């Protein structure tokens, strides 16, 4: 499976990613020189953990026909006081009022299976390489991996 994201710089401190026909937009907060028009990349990092964990909690309940009204998750990063990096990420699962006690530990084990979280626990190696702008590799669109348009007819180029 080839997973490829195309990254664009639409202006200011905004950085956007095109993935499988979806634009993922980011910006920096105003306090950091951005316009605050979109979440920061770090916000999306935390959101990916929360939404992944949330998916596992939701599916756990759905597979057991449990009421999900009131089910919620929160993600809280705890930073290292000596540095800027996060030392712990706490995922809090708020269970619905009628949630059966016998499933309490099981839903936490399900949330623990979040693939985003698991990738952090067993961190991949990162490889950063430089290439000429003439593209040594074909773009995702050239490889047929992404849609170059949207249902409204807007093309990625018109958004830049």
Regions found by a protein language model. Name each.
Residues 1-47, 55-160:
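Extended beta-strand/beta-hairpin segments
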């Amino acid at each position: 499976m080839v997973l490829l994201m195309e990254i664009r710089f639409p202006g200011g401190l905004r950085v956007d990613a095109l993935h499988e026909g979806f634009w993922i937009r980011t910006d920096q907060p105003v306090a950091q020189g951005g316009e605050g028009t979109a979440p920061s990349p770090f916000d999306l990092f935390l959101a990916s953990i929360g939404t992944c964990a949330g998916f596992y909690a939701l599916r756990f309940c759905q597979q057991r026909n449990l009421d999900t009204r009131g089910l919620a998750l929160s993600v809280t990063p705890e930073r290292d006081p000596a540095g800027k990096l996060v030392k712990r990420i706490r995922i809090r699962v708020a269970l619905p009022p009628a949630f059966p006690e016998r499933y309490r530990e099981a839903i936490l084990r399900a949330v623990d299976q979040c693939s985003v979280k698991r990738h952090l626990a067993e961190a991949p190696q990162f490889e950063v390489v430089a290439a000429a702008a003439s593209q040594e590799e074909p773009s995702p669109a050239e490889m047929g991996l992404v849609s170059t348009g949207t249902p409204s007819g807007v093309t990625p180029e018109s958004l830049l």
